[in-house]
Amino acid sequence: MSGTLARSVMVLGTTSGAGKSWLTTALCRYYARQGLKVAPFKAQNMSNNARVVAGGEIGSAQYFQALAARAEPDVRMNPLLLKPEKDTQSQVILMGQVDAELSRMPWRGRSASVWPVIARALDELLAENDVVVIEGAGSPAEINLKSSDIVNMRVAQHTGASCLLVTDIDRGGAFAHLYGTWAMLDEAERQLIKGFVLNKFRGDASLLAPGPQMLQEMTGVPTVATLPMWWQHGLPEEDGVFDMAPTLGTGVSTLPPEGAELARGGPSLRSPRPVIAVIAYPRISNLDEFQPLKNVPGVHLKWVRSPGELAGVDWIILPGSKHTSGDLAWLRAQGLDRAVAAHAEQGGAVLGVCGGLQMLGEALIDPHGIDGNAPGLGLLPVVTVFEEGKTVQRRQARFGELAGAWAALSGVGLQGYEIHHGQTAPHTAMAAAGDIAHGVMAEGLAWQNTRGNVLGLYLHGMFEDPAVLQALFGATVPTLDAVFDGLADYIEQHFEPGVLQSLIATP
């Protein structure tokens, strides 16, 4: 540090899904490679994808951005995290911790309470770093939300950030999106926009002319990068499971032919072309932890929401959930409970992670009204009792002796994290009758059925551990560092010369 406040670069988008998160990640690594001390920042994130850091939870995007910046992830990098539980209800995480009072408060009433906390976190990062790379949210031109803005132009003006405005040209209307967003900003806000970025372009870039020049004549803002479509950049999209789909495995599933089997059981996890299905219920959480599977050669990963899509899969994953009982009810309404049970009955491998583990058991008991009582799927002889307290911690653990489909994980150590309400234990009556849940990790972190094809664990991040991927698939996948360097190389290649340096130049 030079002793002066950091320069700040901010990535704004014309819409959600424009490419803000990955571009912010790329900028973090680009500036870090120059020997600068870099930190990411996003004032408010709405996502059920979260990571555990010192002090609590932050959005997964900011966690990976910190790693790209070669910085220790910190709750100040995402001071406000909203985790949707229902269509009109979110759990509010402030500086890493659940804030029950804010969770009950109407959305428009929160900004006055949280802005001082956001500003303080940002000011501290500015004082401790050379560059802070800031990510906006949605669009900065939502005029109905402007009075309560705490994440876009209010942040940009607070720091005097050099702002890039990025748009997804693949969806069409890119120039209108850019001009319309710019036009709806105040004059002082427009002065902060230093460049437009056309993301996800396919085809001959010369065909864009004279669009960029005309846009610059109308706004005074140059188009500083045209980024070609890049499906395989290695990072998940933040805003939704089906936005991730084109980047996963070898493609997205299509509906099976009429009369196809709903399940087939028993193949090895090292089958030549394993097909892995993740059930995408409405309140799915931490979906990004499955992203590494798409880098495993030959693996076909698909997201499913109907029984027919489970035809021919080798194994089924029930991921985490922000509303376990509600998502379990949805799963039953779709008929997926019967399809998963049929797959398991035929010997097919089933994995439940966190909320997915809880669903696999016999019952979910909720004495405090957190998630609601519900019968489980009955594929693991365990019972989960929800608790008011929330377990949030990073863990190092090791699998014990596993049988059947998951035997390759025996003795494998892994690093992961817990984010859950509730504790899971064997069903006493079933154990007495000989139906035993086998604890395969210390402290009740993982359970397996006697047959050996159904496994449930509380630890998130299993597929991000190289030892697990090696054990299950015999595969070595690119390291995160290699992914981050690839992102930095990409923007260095496609931005106009000198632009990235000019963004952090002293005025």
Swiss-Prot record:
InterPro entries: Class_I_gatase-like, CobQ/CobB/MinD/ParA_Nub-bd_dom, CobQ_GATase1, CobQ_N, CobQ_synth, GATase_3, P-loop_NTPase. GO terms for molecular function: ABC-type vitamin B12 transporter activity; catalytic activity. The active site is at 354 (nucleophile), 460. Keywords: Cobalamin biosynthesis, Glutamine amidotransferase. It comes from the Bacteria. Gene3D superfamilies: 3.40.50.880, P-loop containing nucleotide triphosphate hydrolases. The keyword Signal does not apply. Pathway: Cofactor biosynthesis; adenosylcobalamin biosynthesis. GO terms for biological process: cobalamin biosynthetic process. Disulfide bonds: none annotated. Residues 273-468 form the GATase cobBQ-type domain. Catalyzes amidations at positions B, D, E, and G on adenosylcobyrinic A,C-diamide. NH(2) groups are provided by glutamine, and one molecule of ATP is hydrogenolyzed for each amidation. Belongs to the CobB/CobQ family. CobQ subfamily. NCBIfam families: PRK00784.1. HAMAP family: CobQ. This is Cobyric acid synthase. It comes from Polaromonas sp. (strain JS666 / ATCC BAA-500).
